[in-house]
């Protein structure tokens, strides 16, 4: 799958083997985080295209157009405001 980062103007390949947050860090793209488990909401970003899911609904409050990088499961190519 492909992850397009709008503000970085770059696209990364992604295979769900790690969290999206970990994958971004491995590619030297850093974003704020704290808990890494869906509790705090620090890693939320806007999703513009595509679909994600969660194994368990995160406790952090998110809007329908937001995802948590630390715990989302990418279901398709996505475009995020990052």
Curated annotation (Swiss-Prot):
Please provide, alphabetically and separated by semicolons, the GO molecular function terms listed in this UniProt record: 2 iron, 2 sulfur cluster binding; metal ion binding
Task: Tell me which domain of life the UniProt entry assigns to the organism this sequence originates from.
Answer: Bacteria
Cofactors that this protein relies on: [2Fe-2S] cluster
Q: How is the cofactor bound?
A: Binds 1 [2Fe-2S] cluster.
Residues in 2Fe-2S ferredoxin-type domain copies: 1-82
Please list the disulfide bridges. Answer: none
Chain sites annotated for binding [2Fe-2S] cluster: 35, 40, 43, 72
InterPro entries documented for this protein: 2Fe-2S_ferredoxin-like_sf (IPR036010), 2Fe-2S_ferredoxin-type (IPR001041), 2Fe2S_fd_BS (IPR006058), Beta-grasp_dom_sf (IPR012675)
Q: Which UniProt keywords apply?
A: 2Fe-2S, Electron transport, Iron, Iron-sulfur, Metal-binding, Transport
What Pfam families does the database record attribute to this sequence? Fer2
Q: What is this protein called?
A: Uncharacterized ferredoxin-like protein HI_1309
């Amino acid at each position: 799958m492909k992850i397009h980062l709008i503000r970085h103007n770059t696209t990364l390949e992604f295979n769900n083997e790690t969290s999206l947050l970990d994958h971004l860090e491995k590619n030297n793209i850093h974003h704020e985080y704290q808990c890494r488990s869906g509790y705090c909401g620090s890693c939320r970003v806007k999703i513009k295209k595509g679909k994600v899911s969660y194994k368990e609904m995160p406790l952090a409050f998110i809007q329908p157009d937001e995802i948590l990088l630390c715990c989302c499961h990418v279901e398709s190519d996505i475009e995020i405001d990052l």
